[in-house]
Swiss-Prot record:
Keywords: Cytoplasm, Endoplasmic reticulum, Membrane, mRNA transport, Nucleus, Protein transport, Translocation, Transport. PROSITE patterns: MPN. This is Nuclear protein localization protein 4. The gene is NPL4. Residues 601-611 have a biased composition (Polar residues).
């Protein structure tokens, strides 16, 4: 076999372009000496990376040292192909002083300057923090991203709206079809106007933009139709200038923002499984006069009232540690958040939103920022987006007074543009609840991470003459451009998962309500009646309290949550017969079920409780060491009395 003919490869770096003659059978690490000859003298060899696209633009970047055993012909490179090179420069230190290359000395003499002409201090030259930079793209998200089962189900649906025969316009038989009776697309404007649907559902919007982005008749390559708004400075600009805030160009700076009402919503409806969920949250306000916040746990289900719709079904509300105030709440660190999420997962639930009282309504500016921050924490995974995620299904509900003086529920989401503007630190709440402020651009001379780039922001509105005009959003603009309203309600046929929610709610000690073993014993100790236990565990707050005790193992806790959500007698009997449940019952009988006969001070009562077994004349003596269950019961007993 004849040896492979040499080929010419082109290389491009921020220092310029060069060409190398190589053999197709050469391995990439063998090219390192030739590559270094064409790069600056102070280039760090371990930092050299190769890419099929300009560095920082989403290409397949690989360190050249990791390509050992990979030949040029193996990756499909042919004569004339181009590769892009990224590298870092190193500074030699001699006797405690920096020995710089002449080119770097000239750069220090010509210090980088901002757009306004102000020189950048050297200590500012640090990589920007991850927050104000753009998101990374995912190659083939339709293969790499795992969606929720509900999204997969809605993707497989046809979604078209069937119509009957129009007796006025149709001129065909019952088996025919024409333009007046053919099924409509789920985003058909005439159907939305007829049903008074203000926003498209997410999957209807997806069908609409996918039909215009990917046309099968063109036989072109597939392009993900969804792209999240990006208002942050791009990292690793291919132009080769210093990173922001030292430098910026048209390739890495975000474009101007034009705000418009979002035509779709990620979730269409919020359904509370029972009015008791709302009443229990309002009870705190009635008893304390302060506001309250809770996180919603439930599921996402198909909402049939709108084409391809999604609804959030709330089954429980968990109130994290907080301090209520007359006009708001202050959240404390939620130490057991992961444990509560795990209990919810065992019950088939997830965190789907937040609800808070706002009975002294001061406006919506700070609430929108709060909602946007939470939605940014819980993004929606989708294979239809180039970043693998798009928007969020997290909802926000507010309990406030209406015009008639009654308490009403408002459900909304922050728009995708609002979430991105909060992440990019572009907007902030104002003293006027009806408007949002655009922040001032900041060039920090003390900390590069505090530098803030603010693009131009506009919004469109209909003026007094009926014309659609564009207005400058600086210094402020109406908050309506950042909101998407949702519908809400209660089911006509309630299907309540936790049908025995009488256990005290967590973190309510300030109004005299606390969770303890005695309350737990009243609900769970059955005295031979297993149905009491099976019914008693159907309480989300009780499940979280049991999780905090750490008595049951994970398998027993999963079985407990199964009984709580399914109310199945067979599973309940299996739970009662587990060793962990026997330990729990022993603890409750020893510590929580029987109140003390005398009212002792706490310290002396604890002392007597911990020693009376050994000193009581009628106490039975065991010849064997005490079991772990008995020892654990005594420890709980001594700690819980009082």
């Amino acid at each position: 076999m004849a040896p492979a003919r040499p080929i010419l490869l082109r290389f491009e770096s921020r220092n310029g372009q060069f060409r190398l003659t190589v053999n197709p059978t050469d391995e990439f690490p063998s090219l390192l000496p030739k590559v270094l000859d064409n790069l600056p003298k102070n280039t760090a060899p371990p930092s050299i990376v190769l890419s099929n696209k300009p560095i920082g633009t989403g290409g397949q970047e690989r360190n050249i040292s990791t390509l050992k055993g990979v030949t040029i012909q193996r990756v499909g490179l042919s004569h004339g192909d181009k590769l892009f090179i990224g590298y870092e420069e190193e500074t030699a230190v001699v006797n405690g002083s920096s020995s710089e290359h002449p080119s770097s000395i000239s750069k220090s003499q010509n210090a980088p300057r901002r757009l306004d002409g102000v020189a950048v201090r050297q200590q500012e030259q640090a990589p920007p923090v991850p927050t104000p930079t753009s998101e990374t793209l995912i190659k083939n998200p339709w293969e790499a991203v795992k969606q929720s089962p509900l999204d997969d189900r809605l993707d497989r649906k046809d979604g078209k709206i069937s119509r009957g025969l129009d007796h006025k316009m149709c001129r065909h038989g019952p088996k025919g079809m024409c333009d007046y009776c053919m099924p409509l697309e789920p985003y058909a404007p005439e159907y939305l106007a007829e049903k008074k649907i203000k926003h498209l559902s997410f999957h209807s919007y997806l069908r609409k933009i996918n039909s215009s982005t990917n046309k099968p008749e063109l036989k072109s390559s597939y392009i993900p139709p969804l792209s999240e708004p990006d208002y942050r400075v791009k990292r690793d600009c291919p132009s080769g200038h210093p990173a922001w805030p030292e430098g910026i160009c048209t390739k890495c700076q975000p474009s101007a923002i034009t705000l418009q009402p979002q035509p779709f919503r990620m979730v269409d409806h919020v359904e509370f499984s029972s009015p008791d969920l709302i009443n229990s949250l309002l009870d705190f306000w009635r008893k304390s006069g302060t506001q309250r916040l809770g996180f919603l746990y439930g599921t996402y289900e198909e909402y049939t009232e709108v084409p391809l719709g999604i609804k959030a079904v709330v089954q429980a509300i968990y109130e994290p540690p907080q301090v209520g105030e007359v006009d708001g709440v202050t959240l404390h660190e939620w130490g057991n958040e992961k444990d509560v999420d795990e209990v919810a997962k065992f019950c088939g639930l997830e965190k789907i939103g937040v609800i808070f009282t706002d009975l002294l309504d001061a406006g919506a500016g700070d609430e929108i920022v709060f909602a946007a921050q939470l939605q940014a924490r819980y993004p929606k995974a989708t294979k239809w987006s180039e970043t693998g995620r798009f928007g969020s299904n997290f909802v926000t509900c507010v309990l406030s007074g209406d015009e008639d003086g009654a308490i009403s529920i408002s459900a909304y989401q922050a728009s995708n543009s609002a979430v991105e503007m909060v992440k990019a630190d572009i907007i902030e709440p104002s003293a006027d609840p009806g408007v949002m402020l655009v922040q001032q651009e900041n060039h920090s001379d003390d900390d590069a991470s505090k530098a803030r780039y603010i693009p131009e922001v506009f919004y469109r509105k209909v003026n007094e003459y009926g014309a659609n005009v564009q207005e400058n959003a600086k210094p402020s603009f109406p908050v309506e451009y950042l909101l998407v309203t949702l519908t809400h309600g209660f089911p006509t046929d309630p299907d309540v998962m936790f049908n025995n929610s009488t256990f005290p709610i967590e973190n309510r000690e300030v109004i005299g309500e606390s969770q303890d073993l005695r309350m737990l014993a009243d609900k769970l100790v059955s005295h031979g009646d297993p149905n009491k236990t099976i019914c008693g565990v159907s309480d989300f707050h009780l499940l979280c309290f049991l999780n905090s005790l750490g008595i049951l193992n994970k398998d027993e806790e999963f079985l407990l949550c199964t009984v709580a959500r399914s109310h199945d007698t067979a599973d309940g009997m299996q739970l009662i017969n587990t060793s962990g449940w026997a330990t729990l019952v022993t603890i409750l009988q020893e510590s929580g079920e029987r109140p003390p006969k005398r009212s002792w001070p706490f310290q002396s009562q604890t002392f007597i409780s911990s020693h009376q077994r050994s000193k009581h004349p009628q106490a039975p003596k065991s010849e064997h060491p005490q079991s772990d269950s008995e020892q654990l019961a005594k420890r709980f007993k001594g700690a819980s009395l009082g």
